[in-house]
Amino acid sequence: AHPMKAVLTKPVYGLFQTMAPHAPFALRVVLNNLWCFGGLLCLLAEKLGGEVNAMMRTTFAFTMAQGSKQINVMPNQAVAGVNVRLVNVDTPESVKTYMEKVIGDPHVSVCVTHAQSATPYASTDNAHWHKLSAAIAHTWKGCLVSPYLMIACSDSRHYTGFCDDVYKFS
């Protein structure tokens, strides 16, 4: 496996800062000192896998493969389909370049059939966020309100063209 580089983006940093006071001591030390342990956390993301890993790097899911119709017959051509979920530091072009470099074979072509950049992060430094946070905290007493990087695709991406900030609720 050749995962792309993990990055500590603003929403993930905010999530970790919100979680820190509620974490067990050792994890609290790490989360309160991301300036020192951020690199370690990025390395651990791959080992932890799952949601933490997906929040910190562009991910790949191989969803389709086609080749020969028979087990014992070599195909003239083989095709694989890959679903890529981008973290904001990556672009469709940078991922294509990365895949070509990792594959390292000029006989294999990487074609982008559909591409959409990651949606922008919503600000947590404005009155809208503070009002939303207060309403959530008021409605669900004791609930932690935190920035979060939604790793699923949603229809909210359609609102980014006419809204400065689109907040997703999970």
Predicted regions and their residues:
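Alpha-helical metal-binding/catalytic segments enriched in His/Glu/Asp
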Residues: 1-4, 82
